[in-house]
A protein has these predicted regions:
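Bateman/CBS regulatory modules and CBS-like beta-alpha motifs in cytosolic regions of diverse proteins
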Residues: 3-32, 43-44, 49-52, 63-91, ...
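Signal for well-folded cores of large energy- and translation-related assemblies
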Residues: 34, 93, 123, 153-157
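Short hydrophobic beta-strand motif reused across regulatory alpha/beta modules
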Residues: 39, 51-58, 98, 110-118
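Short low-complexity, flexible loop/linker segments enriched in glycine and/or proline
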Residues: 57-58, 71, 175-179
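Short, composition-biased local secondary-structure segments
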Residues: 60-61, 113-125, 157-160
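A conserved regulatory-domain signal marking ACT and ACT-like small-molecule sensing domains
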Residues: 130-180
């Protein structure tokens, strides 16, 4: 039995991270962001997620103003707790986030994923700490055969520890990275 829970957003979420409230002032928010070394924090009403406060949006208001003044204009970006971590990675990348709220089905914020936690899980997922040789192939998608690659590796008394692939849009080639 493999424990793959590290791949699920709920399992990656930090539970004790500060959550902002509508009555919090800009100066308080900026101090929290500095203390926790992030550029974003979730804004909640009761326990429900209303939006993601960015440092940039807070700098646009006076230090004594509350978050209620900007609540309507916030990004409403979060990841479902049951989602695979690659969904979190997609959101981090697309929106250039430093932190991502993890939400349950009722839109309650159950924790956050930081860039550090995400990076640790990516490293674990790709086996970055495992020893092995890395081979990068560029082939036509029609030539791709996982069974053939596996056969070639295994007949040479080795095994595939990790395999990643993607399409290169400019050339149409399939790029395959093997760790052996």
């Amino acid at each position: 039995y493999l424990n793959n829970n590290f791949m699920i957003a709920n399992e990656m979420a930090i539970k004790g991270f500060p959550m902002l409230r509508l009555e919090d002032t800009a100066s308080f928010v900026l101090q929290c962001m500095e203390d926790y070394e992030v550029q974003h924090l979730p804004l909640l009403k009761d326990e429900y997620f209303i939006g993601l406060v960015s440092k940039e949006s807070v700098l646009d208001i006076a230090v004594d103003q509350t978050l209620a003044t900007i609540a309507e204009n916030l990004l409403r970006i979060g990841v479902n707790g049951g989602a695979h971590f690659t969904k979190a990675l997609e959101l981090f990348s697309k929106h250039e986030l430093s932190l991502l709220p993890v939400l349950n089905e009722q839109q309650e914020c159950v924790g956050v994923i930081t860039q550090k936690i995400l990076n640790e899980n990516i490293a674990r997922f790709i086996g970055a700490e495992q020893n092995g040789a890395i081979i990068v192939l560029s082939i036509s998608p029609y030539q791709y055969s996982l069974a053939e690659m596996s056969r070639l590796v295994e007949t040479n008394n080795a095994q595939i520890l990790q395999l990643n692939s993607f399409f290169e849009p400019a050339t149409g080639a399939m790029i395959i990275t093997l760790k052996i």
